[in-house]
Design a protein with these regions (language model features):
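Hydrophobic ligand-binding cavity/cleft-lining segments
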Residues: 1-42, 136, 152
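Short beta-edge strand/loop motif at the mouth of beta-sheet-based domains
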Residues: 6, 26-61, 71-76
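Residue-level detector of beta-strand structural context in well-folded domains
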Residues: 7-9, 50, 66-67, 92
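Hydrophobic-ligand binding "helix-grip"
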Residues: 30, 55-103, 109-114, 139
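A conserved amphipathic terminal alpha-helix motif
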Residues: 103, 109-152
Length: 152
């Protein structure tokens, strides 16, 4: 059974401001309460085939080994992780809009036998994880944009 979940939000900044915060994977847990840890394990950061460990604090505490599938900074990154019989392909895009804002999008495709346990409650919890992650990332990126504007 395949499951597709997605979330999006608009941010008052450019994709570069979002990427400036997002690319520092080792710092995610400092500003993102859904992440307990994130650290590179193999390869060069953000290169196809590179691996990192993603520790989630919620909706349930778990560590997911992740491999980068594609990365095109500052606009797109995708990775795949496997846990509890689930293959999860997770994508992020940061798309500039004509009004100067950025559409932040994330989507994830889950497959494998473990998806049988993805009831409505689990899906809502994952969507809440996306919303909380993007709320924190948006806050940080908009702060970076305001600071850049103040310096110019």
């Amino acid at each position: 059974m395949a499951i597709h979940l997605e979330h999006s939000v608009s941010a008052k900044c450019r994709p570069e401001h979002i990427w400036q915060k997002f690319e520092n994977l080792d710092q995610w847990s400092w500003w993102n309460r859904v992440i307990s840890q994130s650290k590179w394990q193999e390869g060069q950061p953000w290169q196809k085939g590179s691996r990192f460990l993603l520790g989630l604090a919620r909706p349930m505490s778990m560590e997911v080994p992740v491999e980068i599938l594609e990365c095109a900074p500052p606009q797109k990154v995708g990775w795949v992780g496997k846990f509890f019989g689930v293959r999860a392909e997770h994508w992020f895009s940061f798309e500039p809009q004509p009004d100067g804002t950025t559409l932040m999008k994330t989507w994830e495709d889950f497959s494998g036998p473990g998806t049988l346990f993805f009831g409505n409650g689990r899906r809502k919890a994952v969507l809440k994880l996306y919303a909380d992650w993007f709320e924190a990332l948006k806050f940080e990126a908009e702060r970076i944009a305001r600071e850049a504007a103040a310096r110019s």
